[in-house]
């Protein structure tokens, strides 16, 4: 979805219409033995919270243009606190949500979101931080993928991937080990901050 590193203040829209140029259609869940499954994996660097102070800061969502009611998933930074919110539609509930406290500021960190049937796991830097029991089976949609809409946030997003199955912890750890991409193919006017190679392998605290 995002192969390299992009400025998180600039929106990109990943079309799900295969007839549109540049579209990257996401295959629906493989529906393996455990039923509906899919995962997202990405890197984030949050510079500060002064940008858009008091407003929700958009990371990405898959759904409709205004991010409501279709969010499968939807990921946001809290308006004032260093918290990451993840939303997931299910067949019984529009707004299943989890909040992860103490998101690092000024450091790269990795997030993986794995959905399997009626539960959702969120890993930070390869460590399971929350398992959420959804109210019903997760509900996918055919909407586009919106990255850093509504002004996004102050920082960067890198190596965002989609999997049509629930990735095992071994794949999560591979994604963590690979680190963020340091190139900037998108229209970012400034280079990303210097990356200390060991920032992203330390345990999330």
Q: Each predicted region: which residue ranges?
A:
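Extracellular glycan-associated modules
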Residues: 1-205
């Amino acid at each position: 979805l995002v192969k390299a590193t992009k400025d998180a203040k600039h929106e990109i829209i990943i079309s799900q219409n295969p007839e549109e140029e540049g579209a990257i259609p996401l295959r629906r869940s493989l529906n393996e033995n455990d039923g509906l499954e899919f995962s997202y994996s990405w890197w984030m660097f949050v510079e500060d919270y002064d940008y858009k102070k008091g407003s929700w800061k958009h990371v990405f969502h898959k759904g409709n243009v205004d991010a409501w009611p279709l969010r499968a998933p939807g990921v946001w930074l809290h308006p004032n606190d260093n918290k990451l919110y993840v939303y997931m539609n299910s067949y019984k509930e529009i707004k299943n949500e989890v909040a992860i406290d103490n998101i690092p500021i000024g450091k790269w960190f990795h997030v993986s979101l794995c959905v399997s049937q009626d539960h959702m796991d969120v890993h930070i830097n390869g460590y399971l931080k929350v398992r959420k029991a959804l109210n019903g089976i997760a509900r996918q949609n055919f909407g586009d993928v919106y990255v850093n809409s509504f002004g996004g946030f102050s920082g960067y997003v890198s190596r965002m991937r989609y999997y049509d199955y629930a990735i095992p912890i071994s794949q999560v750890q591979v994604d963590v080990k690979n680190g963020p991409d340091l190139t900037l193919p998108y229209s970012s006017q400034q280079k990303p901050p210097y990356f200390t190679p060991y920032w992203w392998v330390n345990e999330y605290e």
